[in-house]
Amino acid sequence: MNKEIVAQLREWADIYNDLQYFQEDPIAFPTRFAELSARGERCLKDVEVAAVFAAHFAWGRRSMIVRDCGRLFDEMDWRPYDYVMRGVWRDEAVSVHRTIKWSEVAAICGRLKEFYEGHESLEALTVNEMRVGIFGQKEDAKAPNKKINMMRRWMVRDDGKVDLGVWKGTSP
């Protein structure tokens, strides 16, 4: 890559990989739960559930994503893991974010509950296992899996700024 392009990419990274830029971004939700977890007020599973849904909702205008994630976490009483494990989810054919309906959220909650009944963390799941087992999508070797890879980046990479780095057993 030529030096000018590298310099431009680094400049953009310095501008956009900044907490200020991400205050109104889907990562704000798992970040909030990671901060609560660090203080012992929530657990890693809260961070994981928040990351699953924030990544799932991460398409469209950021202001809409943040608004709709806020509605979702209000429904969860800001205790996402407890909400999932209770097994009583809002299950309506009404949209919560764009084309995502509450019934789809309930289905993901059901798969998360089933997973967490036998496992401590989502960290060991492959991209395909997450795609099929958590998001309920068909296997597709050619799928870009953008939301899953974005979520994994949040959870694995620890840049000291934006990404959380809470999954310590996975190398970035």
Question: Whereabouts are the PLM-identified features?
Answer:
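HhH-family (HhH-GPD) DNA N-glycosylase catalytic core used in base-excision repair
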Residues: 1-172
